[in-house]
């Protein structure tokens, strides 16, 4: 599914959180305004250094977050999760909306 990087009602940029799975089954977490573009950059080796030379990459998860400041806080929080917790997020076992709501309340 391709997400549009802009809300239809506003000219405000919408941010997304994404997780990429590497060939060795690690999960990389990032944020962007355009998930397909950013994923192509990672695949071409022009994204994060952490993903260069890691073999085939798969987009494991992406979700609309909203504002940049919230996306940054969410990215930090997800990076602190254990591998098991990230896998549960990817599998949909942990409600992303719950995590997002907790951050909005902070």
UniProtKB/Swiss-Prot annotation:
Gene3D superfamilies: GIY-YIG endonuclease
InterPro entries referenced in this protein's UniProt entry, alphabetically: GIY-YIG_endonuc (IPR000305), GIY-YIG_endonuc_sf (IPR035901), UPF0213_domain (IPR050190), UPF0213_GIY-YIG_endonuc (IPR022992)
Top-level division of the source organism's lineage: Bacteria
PROSITE patterns: GIY_YIG
Domain GIY-YIG: 13-88
Stated family: Belongs to the UPF0213 family.
Descriptive protein name: UPF0213 protein KPN78578_35340
Organism: Klebsiella pneumoniae subsp. pneumoniae (strain ATCC 700721 / MGH 78578)
